[in-house]
């Protein structure tokens, strides 16, 4: 799993990861942190966390304009690529549409399945992002509490 936010701040991601573990899957989660002391690997309730240091600008501002600014994707491609070169995975599971490009890149480069799990309502972005209007994604989830 790849999450552009800090963890365990997102309860939905935690519940999903724990459900996958309960079903017999090994779950790794690559996520951002703004605190140097949290950088590195940790086991959290069976979830193998891989935290990478982000800057406040990248974390708060760049993701707003990520569809226009390539350095946001470059940062995440580097992090995902580093993890995929050291670990073996069958699937890359991206949380939220802004990182869909990174998931598609990993699918092509590393030959793994790509799951996009959108926790937010991004209908206005669906027309803009070719990754959601094609067969480039193997599975697309959208889980909203309310519509």
Language-model regions: role of each:
Residues 58-60, 123-128:
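Short acidic/His/Gly/Ser-rich catalytic and metal-binding motifs that mark active-site loops
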Residues 78-82, 105-109, 122, 136-147:
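Membrane-proximal helix-turn-helix segments that form the acceptor-binding/catalytic region
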Residues 44-49, 110-111, 132-135:
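Short, hinge-like loop/turn segments at secondary-structure boundaries
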Residues 10, 37, 73, 89-126:
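An aromatic- and histidine-rich active-site surface loop
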Residues 83-89:
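Glycine-rich phosphate-binding loop signature in dinucleotide/nucleotide-binding domains
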Residues 50-78, 133-139:
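A short, charged, and often flexible helix/loop element on the N-terminal side
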Residues 1-48:
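N-terminal subdomain of nucleotide-sugar transferases
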């Amino acid at each position: 799993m790849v999450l552009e936010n800090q963890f365990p701040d997102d309860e939905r991601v935690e519940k999903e990861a724990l459900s996958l573990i309960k079903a017999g899957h090994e779950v790794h989660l690559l996520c951002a942190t703004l605190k140097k002391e949290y950088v590195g690997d940790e086991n959290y309730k069976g979830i193998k966390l891989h935290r990478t240091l982000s800057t406040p600008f990248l974390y708060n501002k760049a993701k707003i304009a990520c569809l226009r600014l390539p350095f946001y994707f470059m940062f995440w491609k580097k992090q995902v690529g580093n993890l995929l070169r050291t670990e073996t995975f069958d699937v890359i599971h991206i949380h939220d549409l802004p990182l869909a490009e990174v998931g598609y890149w990993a699918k092509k480069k590393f030959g793994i399945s790509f799951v996009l799990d959108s926790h937010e309502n991004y209908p206005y972005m669906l027309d803009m992002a070719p990754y959601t209007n094609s067969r480039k994604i193997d599975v697309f989830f959208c889980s909203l509490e309310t519509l």
